[in-house]
Swiss-Prot record:
The gene is queF. This is NADPH-dependent 7-cyano-7-deazaguanine reductase. NCBIfam families: QueF. The active site is at residues 184, 191. One of its GO terms (molecular function) is preQ1 synthase activity. One of its GO terms (cellular component) is cytoplasm. It comes from Pseudomonas putida (strain GB-1).
């Protein structure tokens, strides 16, 4: 467990405060988990973003009438902190009985508080239900590897030695799997996700990728660190010209988390999958 997470509200009984309470936000420094992967804030081998989507966003108009919407938050992957998910939920719940004179006032408040917690500017979009409904759900790009016939026996810890590639062949391809699962390091609750690997480099053995991804099944870590570990293990093996790894997780507590990591600048969309 991350030492800072022990002091977070995650896994504890909490009072749900219904009026504006930014002190609910609990930042967790990324540095400890980066150190486990052998990287520092100065040597990050990726660019990217963590998209958070909130489906329980509500506040009051000056008339007292409530409004509901969907929040989209973009936290830079190089921000000093992640925001612990239950604290994020408690903070958003604190807006439920809070009056905002305009949508702009609400958005400015969210940007200020979330940026302060993350330690870097956080992008905020407040979207109408009609807008999100019209967008619908999308399928992941590339080839799904979940139908491959593989024998699997390890579920406890990620095992990069399972990965194999053809060093004599360079390919450019996109692969995806819906079989990513890990566990919350604090509560032990399951985190279900779908993962995409886009790369140009040594030809990755698809079956080995599937067995590797399933090896996360009982692993305890936060969403962001799981994606960073996958990214680094593939980068070390494939020596790619470019590599992008991203995962879209099933929501819990009204929030879903979607980390993106890439060798270069990316402009990811934030479109929902069928399980989101």
């Amino acid at each position: 467990m991350h030492p800072a997470a022990e002091h977070s509200p995650l896994g504890k009984s909490s009072e749900y405060i219904a009026t504006y309470s930014p002190e609910q936000l609990f930042p967790i420094p990324r540095t400890a988990k980066w150190a486990e992967l052998g990287v520092t804030a100065q040597t990050l081998p990726w660019q990217g973003v963590d998209y958070w989507n909130c489906f329980e966003l509500s506040w009051l108009l000056p008339s007292g009438k409530p409004v509901v919407a969907i929040g989209e938050f973009a936290i830079p992957a190089d921000s000093p902190n992640i925001i612990e998910s239950k604290s994020f939920k408690l903070y958003l719940n604190s807006l439920n009985q809070t009056v905002f004179a305009s949508l702009g006032e609400l958005q400015a408040c969210l940007e200020k508080d979330l940026s302060a917690a993350a330690g870097k500017p956080v992008g905020v979009k407040v979207r109408t239900l009609a807008e999100v409904e019209a967008q619908g759900v999308v399928a992941l790009p590339g080839q799904c590897i979940d139908g491959l016939d593989v024998a699997i026996s390890n579920y406890e810890q990620p095992q990069p030695e399972l990965l194999r590639c053809n060093t004599a062949q360079v390919v450019e391809e996109t692969l995806h799997s819906h079989l990513l699962k890990s566990n919350c390091p604090v509560t032990g609750q399951p985190d279900w996700g779908s993962v995409v690997v886009e790369y140009k480099g040594r030809a990755l053995d698809h079956a080995s990728l599937l067995t590797y991804l399933v090896s996360f099944r009982q692993h305890a870590d936060f969403h962001e660190q799981c994606v960073e570990r996958i990214y680094l293990d593939l980068k070390n093996l494939l020596q790619p010209e470019h590599l992008t790894v991203y995962a879209r997780y099933v929501r819990r507590g009204g929030l879903d988390i979607n980390p993106y990591r890439s060798t270069g600048v990316i402009k990811p969309d934030n479109k929902r999958l069928v399980r989101q």
